């Protein structure tokens, strides 16, 4: 009898506990309300009971989100994520909450966390692609869309209509209509469009169609003729008049992307006449030819400084005439190469050899030079808008002088580019490291120069390459190492004018190892320049104003230049 009474009591106790648990555990009721999307009732049910499971946090968080209680929804879903860190539902829904509050950066982080849990989740990939698309980062949007076989593009349109030949523009786009647009197709198309050299600014956009597919819209600022208006043509041609030079330019000849660029400088110390013609080879944007001629008559006074006390190391008048031809090939989106040849003649007059100008540097006569260049993109992080690229050039030359000379110039480049903002180019950061090495005996005009000067691209921005109008005040040499860092802040953007301001830091060293005397041309020590610069764009023409300070000597430099 006692055993029977004990069994009856045990059964009664268990039934009571089950009844109480059924009354207190809201999971079943919450799930039912969730499936029926009865959000107010679900909130009322769960706000008064302890939620000890991730599922309850999920139901409650979504109900709060549907009622637009964003902050509480975020806290609840975060609690559920802590209970179930491997459940992808929580970061996806947290991304939705952040998205509704326009917190795109937070939404992207949550979706990337979800994709680390399940890289094939279609909803998360499409959601993340949509956010990047709304931010204007089409490259990253395609990266995630491509995982789910999207987007399908039906046609390519130019808005507004362009003057370039439609067939040429069509060949510049690597994509095919009625197919999925991929990241590689986008990047290859961008490389080809850039290679046409008639689009200083452009955008490739996607426009949704009613059937769920897309059209590619190409919006571009096109260079055509002397300019898009008389004012622009005048400014392009005479923008350098204060530097005693004019730069007539004619772009997109007959819609063929053939460009004719020229420069005429009448400065008595830096006379120069230059012309270049370039265009797609046989109408193929993957290939581009360039031919040109360059005539120079320059007075040089080689000295140790552009300001203050200075020692003259030598002086001369250089006359140089050259013609050149080259072919450039785009190989996909990341690689391109250039091969060319140059034939030139030089002679020197009014030479003051001083202690620096050796007979090898003053070699005269005809020269032939073979040039090769290779550029390759090493790394690309489109989410961070960060790229690292590299380049190498080789110039092998032979001079028919008495005696004859030959040389080889090698240069390498490593460049980093970062756009820290999700949109636009505000606070753009650039860093370039370049190095050069010379083998053999080079003539004077083949030496490298570290300094800011209109005919030189190896800038130390507190070392001006001219003094009293004559070149020769910047360090010269056969071997160099140069680092240029700068950042730009957008300060003004109007209809015809844009202004950027920012600091810079240049570090470099240059030396000449050919002889003891020629070593006086180099810097001997490391150079450190810092300062600020303003970059103006006026009717498509670039103007750069520079203030630089030489941290080694304390010299201040002010410089202005006009470019394309």
Predicted regions and their residues:
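Helix-start (N-cap) detector for alpha-helical repeat units in TPR-like alpha-solenoids
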Residues: 54-55, 88-89, 122-123
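Periplasmic polypeptide-binding modules associated with outer-membrane biogenesis and secretion
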Residues: 78-81, 96-100, 104-239, 246-250, ...
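Gram-negative/organellar outer-membrane beta-barrel architecture
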Residues: 189-389, 452-468, 473-483, 542-564
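Register position in tetratricopeptide repeats
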Residues: 35-36, 66-67, 100-101, 134
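C-terminal outer-membrane beta-barrel translocator/porin domains of Gram-negative envelope proteins
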Residues: 367-499, 503-504, 511-513, 558-562
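N-terminal leader/linker segments that initiate helical-solenoid repeat arrays
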Residues: 22-55, 59
